[in-house]
Amino acid sequence: MAAPMEVVVCTDSAAPLWSCMVWELHSGANLLTYRGGQAGPRGLALLNGEYLLAAQQGKNYICAWELQRKDQLQQKIMCPGPVTCLTTAPNGLYVLAGIAESIYLWEVSTGNLLVILSRHYQDVSCLKFTGDGSHFVSAGKDCLVLAWSLCSVLQADPSRILAPRHVWSQHTLPITDLHCGFGGPMARVATASLDQTMKLWAISSGDLLLSVLFDMGITSVTMDLAEHYIFCGGSDGSIFQVDLCSRPGPREQSFQPEQNTGKVFKGHRNQVTCLSVSTDGSILLSGSHDESVRLWDVKSKQCVRTVPLKGPVTNAAITLAPPSMLNPEFRPSLPLPHFNKHLLGAEHGDEAQGGGLRLQLGLHLQGKEPSYLERLEQLQAALSGYLEKNMLGSQMLPVRVFELEEEVRSLRKINRDLFDFSTRIITRPSK
């Protein structure tokens, strides 16, 4: 069985003919191009291996393509404002988008907007799910990093303000990028900031594990799959490699390029906007505002390929090609629904909207039904009200009274028979 193909998915801010380009990692062969707009930074995501989502730069909608129908825009997902960052759950069930200082969470199967999280004070700049989808992390220009439990967010009382699991506030300038490692709730999160630091956090405990100070602002960050190294892109185009498996050191460190000459990648002429590592950890991908994507050999720190683009690179990542990307006959398992702009129940009450299911509880979970005596009392009350509201001289009144009295007698007999039957069953001697 052939090994899965690794591909590069990248976008820039000035491509006149295409929105996103996909090319094979090792050969550089162009495989696919998608047309329909310009994706903003941190605004590109694959959805369940079937759709490609791109948040349009400075616009209030997200473009969605089927992976194989690259020339036909499938849908425009309208949003309440310009989308600043975008991500999807690994299982394909949820979509997260940062809009201004709020986080919007959609359910993919129905298109319902489930929750709006408003705990940032300035624009949200980064969003990432953990590998198992149990948590997600948000970061913003307000220097805050928030770790959220997805289960807690979905089960929270809408009337209460949702609280993140952890609030990390040690950065002093806007956060530019973040990366979630593997491990689910035990994962580690790396964050990059213009305050010239990269920080490493533990989701399980909320502790700060490592802080590295550089001599420039850090604009991108990533880790290899084994989490042996952290790669940090600088504002001047340099890329720094931080070793996580060296001998134990202090929690707060300073990276000196002159003392770590073998751990610096040099070649870009402008700030590094995105970083990604191949599955075997041997190749580092970088995108920059110098309008180029570069591939680096991690061991030698040499650039092995440069791909020129038409504008500053906004997104670039290495990923395993989904089967649908290379199969022209593939079609999505489910069509992409219409995504709502308003919270579920906000516009049309609490009734389930189209695409939802109405669940009926079992008999043992349903509320107690009224007995025949209670129904009889209700009937007598209705009869009294009827007599009071209607004229006594009406010709139909005696007939209606007779009918109601007959119904009362019938209900009394039914209730008496049920009582006798229940008494016989309860008092029947056991064999």
Swiss-Prot record:
Its main location: nucleus. SMART domains: WD40. GO terms for biological process: DNA-templated DNA replication; rRNA processing. GO terms for cellular component: dynein axonemal particle; nuclear pre-replicative complex; nucleolus; rixosome complex. InterPro entries: G-protein_beta_WD-40_rep (IPR020472), WD40/YVTN_repeat-like_dom_sf (IPR015943), WD40_repeat_CS (IPR019775), WD40_repeat_dom_sf (IPR036322), WD40_rpt (IPR001680), WDR18/Ipi3/RID3 (IPR045227), Wdr18_C_dom (IPR026987). Pfam families: WD40 (PF00400), WD40_alt (PF14077). WD repeats lie at residues 36-75, 78-116, 119-158, 170-211, 213-257, 267-306. PROSITE patterns: WD_REPEATS_1, WD_REPEATS_2, WD_REPEATS_REGION. It is found in: Nucleus, Nucleolus; Nucleus, Nucleoplasm; Cytoplasm; Dynein axonemal particle. Keywords: Cytoplasm, Developmental protein, Nucleus, Repeat, WD repeat. It comes from the Eukaryota. Disulfide bonds: none annotated. PANTHER family: WD REPEAT-CONTAINING PROTEIN 18, WD-REPEAT PROTEIN 18. Component of the 5FMC complex, at least composed of PELP1, LAS1L, TEX10, WDR18 and SENP3; the complex interacts with methylated CHTOP and ZNF148. Interacts with NOL9. Component of the PELP1 complex, composed of at least PELP1, TEX10 and WDR18. The complex interacts with pre-60S ribosome particles. Belongs to the WD repeat IPI3/WDR18 family. Functions as a component of the Five Friends of Methylated CHTOP (5FMC) complex; the 5FMC complex is recruited to ZNF148 by methylated CHTOP, leading to desumoylation of ZNF148 and subsequent transactivation of ZNF148 target genes. Component of the PELP1 complex involved in the nucleolar steps of 28S rRNA maturation and the subsequent nucleoplasmic transit of the pre-60S ribosomal subunit. May play a role during development. This is WD repeat-containing protein 18. The lineage of its organism: Eukaryota, Metazoa, Chordata, Craniata, Vertebrata. The gene is Wdr18.
